[in-house]
Design a protein with these regions (language model features):
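Trp/Phe/Arg-rich N-terminal binding region typifying the photolyase-homology
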Residues: 1-140
Length: 140
């Protein structure tokens, strides 16, 4: 019997299960889903109060995902390295995430997507933070 390869859903600023296109797509694929939140340099740059709120939000989010039989893995380090290690550990087929639009995140996410695809893995980003992606809006 062959084991289905899971899809990793990388959560960042989008700790929710409703109206989450990346999570919906992963669940619709019919394979196991693994959720991950990575404490990286961007999270490290937060002040004490936002870090406290994030910790509390992650506690609640872990319980919410558990009710859906989706484990939430918490890791620390550079996102690309953490995702590579998690893919190796879980034999995942790919990673899905919601797009972020600030320059540092765009640069990081573009590099991660290229790296994953170069390894033959699925790397999909989804809208989810804005009503429209910035490049789709035009003035008349």
């Amino acid at each position: 019997m062959s084991k289905e390869k899971p899809i990793i859903v990388w959560f960042r600023r989008d700790l929710r299960v409703s109206d989450h296109p990346a999570l919906s797509a992963a669940c619709a694929a019919g394979v196991p889903v693994i959720a991950v939140f990575i404490k990286d340099d961007i999270v490290d740059g937060l002040g004490a109060a936002p870090k406290w709120r994030l910790g509390k939000a992650l506690e609640v989010f872990t319980q919410t995902l558990a009710r859906l039989n989706i484990p939430l893995i918490l890791r620390e380090g550079p996102a690309g390295d953490v995702l590579d290690a998690l893919i190796t550990e879980t034999d995942a087929q790919g990673v899905y995430w919601s797009r972020l639009y600030d320059p540092a995140c765009v640069t990081r996410d573009t590099a991660i997507k290229a790296d994953l695809r170069s390894k033959g893995l699925e790397a999909r980003s989804f809208g989810g933070h804005l009503m429209f992606d910035p490049w789709t809006v035009e003035t008349k």
